[in-house]
Amino acid sequence: MKAKEIDGNLLKLIITNGSIKLKNQHQQINDLNVFPVPDGDTGSNMQSTMMSGVSAIRNLENQPVEAVGKALSRGLLMGARGNSGVILSQLFSGFAKSFQSLKTADAPAFIEGLKQGVQQAYGAVINPVEGTILTVAREAADKASLYATPDADIEEVLEIYLNEAKASLNRTPELLPVLKESGVVDSGGAGLIVIIEGMISALRGEVYQEEQAKAHVAKVHDIEGEVEFGYCTEFIIQLDPEKRFNKDKLVKQLTRLGDSIVVVADDEICKVHVHTKTPGDALNLGQQYGEFATLKIENMTLQHTEILLNAESSVHEEATPTPHDVFRVEAKKKYGLISVVNGDGLHAMFKEMGVDRIIDGGQTMNPSTEDILSA
């Protein structure tokens, strides 16, 4: 029987199924990644973001769609990774907002959620670029809104959305020249389609299980010349209520530092994503409004170089990789970065930031020369 409406349990099921399908296929999405930076991590970032949302709703049973949607939104925002991940979190956060005060959601509420998701995602991106996941989501939501009848079931709505999303995805190379030059479609839009396919499968009774990650040599999309991409800088600030947060001011300041800027804020936290060559300056701008809940800095030039080295040597890890490490190999560097830290928390943070070797500084924070040389 077709579902005319969904409750909290069914919402959790379809979101989980879509997320798992994306996780199982994220390497194919990585292989499409050329914009905004060809660092091969769009699929990894999107699946990591969605699985964070899944973790936030996993233990919710027999809850109204409002409660599941609210938990999903916060989980996605807190776990959002990369430009594509933050945009994806906003698509689903806006989607969930249409469920406020609802125990169940029918097709009109579902369609309204798809439209609100687009509005919220566009609002979070400082300079929206067409030919990306934004375009795919917008055109698909518009088509669902126009052609889904008031008495449609949820599966019909998603099928209309999916068909238009696929058509829109095929048009992305005409909107974004770098895609056409590389012979690919937009990776973020492709990832969104995989999620929707998984959601529809759940409504049809096909439930996916997480598959064992397989070794994979990333597909290379090289660019001519020597290019520096800078640092993918992300952080969440726990806003200080005594410090007046000014989103417009922060955005203006970040614009001077870089691009691919996404800023999302509510009454408690602010999530920032920016590509910049001066990540420290970006962190300082954020910290004026509170303290860091999380932060991540990745050298995108190094990421791209490692993908090239990986493809040339066909060297890859045999151990089960993490989403971030799935395309990472140990490459010889001219220089290595060693940090001296004290405590497991700092150790984990610096490791996440890509430090090559970490020395436990102990109480004195003064390691010997031998300690440094042997690191």
Locate each region found by the language model:
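N-terminal loops that bind phosphate or other acidic moieties
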Residues: 1-375
